[in-house]
Structures are given as C-alpha cells and as structure tokens.
Swiss-Prot record:
<comment type="similarity">
    <text>Belongs to the RNase Y family.</text>
</comment>
<dbReference type="Pfam" id="PF12072">
    <property type="entry name" value="RNase_Y_N"/>
</dbReference>
<dbReference type="InterPro" id="IPR017705">
    <property type="entry name" value="Ribonuclease_Y"/>
</dbReference>
<dbReference type="InterPro" id="IPR004087">
    <property type="entry name" value="KH_dom"/>
</dbReference>
<dbReference type="InterPro" id="IPR004088">
    <property type="entry name" value="KH_dom_type_1"/>
</dbReference>
<dbReference type="GO" id="GO:0004521">
    <property type="term" value="F:RNA endonuclease activity"/>
</dbReference>
<feature type="domain" description="HD">
    <location>
        <begin position="329"/>
        <end position="422"/>
    </location>
</feature>
<dbReference type="Pfam" id="PF00013">
    <property type="entry name" value="KH_1"/>
</dbReference>
<feature type="compositionally biased region" description="Basic and acidic residues">
    <location>
        <begin position="82"/>
        <end position="96"/>
    </location>
</feature>
<dbReference type="GO" id="GO:0005886">
    <property type="term" value="C:plasma membrane"/>
</dbReference>
<keyword id="KW-0694">RNA-binding</keyword>
<dbReference type="Pfam" id="PF01966">
    <property type="entry name" value="HD"/>
</dbReference>
<dbReference type="GO" id="GO:0006402">
    <property type="term" value="P:mRNA catabolic process"/>
</dbReference>
<dbReference type="InterPro" id="IPR006675">
    <property type="entry name" value="HDIG_dom"/>
</dbReference>
<keyword id="KW-1003">Cell membrane</keyword>
<dbReference type="GO" id="GO:0003723">
    <property type="term" value="F:RNA binding"/>
</dbReference>
<keyword id="KW-0812">Transmembrane</keyword>
Length: 513
C-alpha cells in the first residue's frame, strides 16, 4: 500500500469520526433540547395553574364584594321603599282628614249663612225699633238726637277732665316721690361702692437725711449749693434746727418732686456742687416727665379706658402733681370716674362713656397756658382737639354750667364731681386760694418778653424772675423788676410785701483738649 492509500484511509477515518461525533452531538443536543422544552412546559403549566388560581381568587373576591354591595343596595332600597310606603300612608291619612275638615267647613258655612240671615233680620227690626223709640224720646224731651248727644258729650268731657286731672296729679306726686327715693338710692349706693382715701395735699415736702453733717454739704460754701438748687428746681429749701430733715417748700408739686429726687441722688452720689446740681436736676426733670406718662398709662388701664390720645394720657398723669382745693386732682378724677360709671349703670346708660367723661372732666386744670379761660371750657377744647366724642366734650365743658348740657352724661358728671368734692375733709379752700395767688404771681411775670422762668417762693413773699442773657441787658433788668412790682401792686391782693428778684446770668463754656 502506498502513501496515497494511507492518506485516503486516514481521511476517510477522519470523516467517519467527524460524522460519528456530529451524530452523537446532534443526538445529545436533541435530547437536551427536548429536556429543556419538557421542563419549560412543566413550568409553564405550573405558572398557568398558579395564575388561574389567582384569577379565580380575585374573581371570587370581586364576586363577594359585588354581592355585598348588591345586598347593601337592596337593603337601602327596601328601607327607602318602606319609608315611601309610610309617607304614602301618612299622605293618604292627611287627605282623608282634609276631606273630612272640608265637609265640616261646608256644614259650618251653611250654619253661619243661616245665622247671618237671622242676624240681618234682627238688625232690621232693631233699627226700626230704635227709630220709633228715638222719635218718641224727642217728642217727650223736646231735644233732637244731635242736641242730646252734644249735651251728653259735654257732660262726659267735664267729668273725664276732672278724673284725668286728679289722676295726673296723683301720678306726678307718686313719680316725684319715687324719683326722689330712687335718686337718693342711686347716690347712696354709688358713694358706698366708691371708697377712697381722704388726704389733703400740702405745699411742703420733708426730705429726710441720715445725719446733720449732710446739711452743711447741701448748703455749700456761703450757701452756693442751696442757691443753685433753688434756682434750678424753682422751690424754696428750708434748712433749720429740725434734726435729720430738710423742708422743700413750693406750691408746685412737680418742682418739689424734682427737688426731692435730685437731692436724693446728690446725697447718694456725694458730689454736691452747682454744676453737678444743674446736671442732676435736668436729668431728674426728664425722669419725672417719664413717670408722669407712666402714671397716665396705669390710670387708664386700671379704669379700663382705651383709645385716649397720648397727650391726654400725659395730662392725666400730670394730675398726680395737681391739687384742687387741697384735694389731689388725679384721685378726685378717678373717684369721679368710678362714681359716673356706677350711676350710669344704675340709670341704664353707657358706663364706659360716663367713666371716660368723669376721668377727663378736670383735664383743663392741668395745662399752665390760657389761665384766663375757665378750666371746664379749656378741658372741652382739649377734648375736641384730641378727637373725643361730642357728648364727652359736652360733659367736660358743662359740668360747671359754662355751656348747655346736650347729653345725659353731662348731669351725671356734674353730680359725681359735686359728690367727690363735697365729702367731709375732701377739700380745703384756703390752700387752693394760696396756690392760685402764687400761680398768678408767676404767670404775671411770665407775660414779659425775655422771661424764661419764674419761681414764687417763701409763701409768695419773693418772686424770682430768670431772664435770658441774649434777650435783655443789665440796664433793662432793673426796669423789668420795677414794672413787675408795679403790676403786682395794681392787679393783685397780697399780705405784706413781695420781693422781686430778676436774675440775668451769662455763661461762656469752653473745653481744653
């Protein structure tokens, strides 16, 4: 055998081997494919059965839900049907009742028609009888029916007038007695329900010190400290033998309070000299102004009054440092406000409005300007200026009869003002006249041009007038003091003599840096 034959057999062997491998591989692949397909069919069948079960469960669930809904709707329909049947029965019963009532009404109508015919017949007979009797009476009395009627009316009229007059007089007397009793009851109840302290305002303040050594420091060298404090505060300081006490005298409570607080701060600080005194007095004056505003706010809050203008609140706070015939003005105004509210409630009026008018009724006593205008009219102008209601303004202006009373609140304010001021010990006219005289002294001096401040001290026996250095000169100072003295002699009544001191001070301040 040659090489060719070997190669041929080798090739045929390879072909046969490859064919056998291919057949075996094909058989294996076919078997594997059939296994995979069988497994897939089994899994598909399982999934199919699972899905069928899920669908069946959902179907059964939906079927159950639908059956429940159908049952509920059937129940509702049955309920509605039963209600409709009940309503139908009710309507049928009502229809029967209406039919029955209609039959009864027809029967009553027939009876009324018969009765009306009988009444008409009787009326005709009565008219005929009346005519016959009237003619018979006229023939007997000799008077016609009209004349007899007129005489009867006149007789009845006179009798009615007499009875009415007696009845009216009786009602008037009873009303007077009732009104008098009711008025007394209201006033007594109002006074009983307002309990206030009675305290007479003085024109001096006692400043207590720890030791008499401080007196010398307050007086200063040759009295310069005490003079500086008197000039800055506008009050008289009395240092005598009274142990541990200094008396601050002045008719203006604001000035006395400023001097007291300034002294307190100076003594605590220890530095007492004219420059420090002026600085402290200026600082304390601002503090007192803030305290005045705070007092006004507390007062209106305590009384439950809202919506007041800030300037009115400031004036109310300033009442704390004003007095009327020795009676503290703020206490008097609060008392009057409470009395007005109680009395207005008893009379069926607005208590809040009455309380507001009572608080503001003496607001015209607070400002220092326009002294020639009565305080009631000045108070009314202030209320009008700060947009208070017309009946409030009228009550303030009319409580001393300067203007006509236009509302029911005005007489209440007038009465309550009188009640508050008429209590035993509430007022002291001598002090009021004294304070008015000192105030008139200061206002007289303030009327001159160039005057900055005026202070009446030593119970009105000395008037200190401070003028601006830029508006006057030394030559005019003496002329001014003489003019003021002459006017005081001509226009005012005063005991003893009044010393007029005009102070003109020029200062030049520089700072070294």
């Amino acid at each position: 055998m040659g090489i060719g034959t070997l190669l041929l057999f080798t090739f045929l062997g390879l072909v046969a081997g490859a064919t056998a491998v291919w057949l075996i591989t094909r058989t294996l692949l076919k078997q594997r494919t059939e296994g995979i397909l069988a497994e897939a069919r089994r899994e598909a069948e399982v999934i199919k059965q699972k899905k069928l079960l899920e669908v069946k469960e959902k179907f059964l669930q939906l079927k159950g839900d639908l059956e429940k809904q159908v049952a509920q709707r059937n129940s509702k329909l049955q309920s509605v049907e039963s209600k409709l049947k009940s309503r139908e029965q009710t309507l049928n019963q009502r229809q029967e009742d209406i039919t029955k009532k209609g039959q009864e009404m027809d029967l009553m109508r027939e009876n009324l028609t018969a009765q009306l015919s009988v009444i008409e017949k009787k009326k005709t007979e009565l008219d005929e009888l009346k005519t016959r009797e009237q003619a018979h009476l006229e023939s007997l009395s000799g008077l016609s029916a009209a004349e007899a009627k007129d005489r009867l009316v006149e007789s009845l009229k006179d009798e009615a007038k007499g009875q009415a007059s007696a009845y009216v007089n009786e009602i008037i007397e009873e009303a007077k007695m009732t009104a008098n009793k009711e008025a007394k009851r209201i006033v007594i109840q109002s006074i009983q329900r307002v309990a206030t302290e009675t305290a007479i305002e003085n024109s001096v303040t006692v400043f207590h010190i720890e030791s008499d050594e401080i007196k010398g420091r307050i007086i200063g060298r040759e009295g310069r400290n005490i003079r500086a404090l008197e000039a800055a505060a506008g009050i008289e300081i009395i240092v005598d033998d009274t142990p541990e006490a200094i008396v601050l005298s002045g008719f203006d409570p604001v000035r006395r309070e400023i001097a007291r607080l300034a002294l307190h701060q100076l003594v605590q600080d220890g530095r007492i000299h004219p420059a420090r005194i002026e600085e402290v007095v200026s600082k304390v004056r601002k503090q007192v102004e803030e305290e005045i505003i705070e007092t006004g706010k507390r007062t209106v809050i305590d009384l439950g009054i809202h919506g007041l203008h800030p300037e009115l609140i400031r004036l109310i706070g300033k009442m704390k440092y004003r007095s009327s015939y020795g009676q503290n003005l703020l206490q008097h105004s609060r008392e009057t406000a409470n009395l007005c509210a109680i009395m207005a409630s008893e009379l069926g009026l607005n208590p809040k409005k009455a309380k507001r008018a009572g608080l503001l009724h003496d607001i015209g006593k607070v400002p220092d300007d326009e002294p020639e205008l009565p305080h009631a009219l000045l108070g009314m102008k202030l209320c009008e200026k700060f947009k208070e209601k017309p009946d409030i303004c009228n009550a303030v202006g009319a409580h001393h009869d300067e203007v006509e009373m236009m509302s029911l609140i005005a007489p209440i304010v007038q009465v309550c003002d009188a009640i508050s001021g008429a209590r035993p010990g509430a007022r002291r006219e001598i002090v009021e006249a004294y304070i008015k005289r000192l105030n008139d002294l200061e206002q007289l001096a303030m009327s001159y041009p160039g005057v900055i401040k005026t202070y009446a001290i030593q119970a009105g026996r000395e008037l200190r007038v401070i003028v601006g250095a830029d508006k006057t000169d030394d030559a005019s100072v003496e002329t001014l003091s003489n003019e003021i003295a002459k006017r005081i002699q001509d226009e005012m009544t005063y005991p003893g003599q009044v010393k007029i001191t005009v102070i003109r001070e020029s200062r030049s301040v520089s700072y070294a840096k």
